[in-house]
Amino acid sequence: MNLNFKLLDGGILPTRAHKADAGFDLYSPEDFMVKNEDSHTIPLKVCVEIPVGYVGFIMGRSSLNRQGLLCLTGVIDSGYTGEIAVILHNTTRKQAGIYDGVHFFKGDRIAQLVICKLADIEDAVAVDKLEDTERGDGGFGSTGA
């Protein structure tokens, strides 16, 4: 199966470094900066056609995490065919005169698009009790550090 992309003026075709990679690298279509303690939305000038029965997730890259940047996860449903965008947040604290933000240039990889097959679920149903499991309702670190 191929994944169809429509490039708007200045958009860069997403790629995978290796055929077995989970995500398609998403590229910045222009230069920009994410200032410390700030968020920046980057329209990618790219549209994607997610096949029916699948969903696309915009995810961060580990190289950005090392710089104090978080990519806010985006969900792309199969019915959406408009321009996709990435939201980056810089967690670095403001320190006068030391470091004002992270600079990106046209063509930099800024996020990745991961495509996942959806489970075949009909509808949401309210019930009085859920099935018992080994884990139960333990969450938020209940299985260890």
Predicted regions and their residues:
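DUTPase catalytic domain/fold
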Residues: 1-145
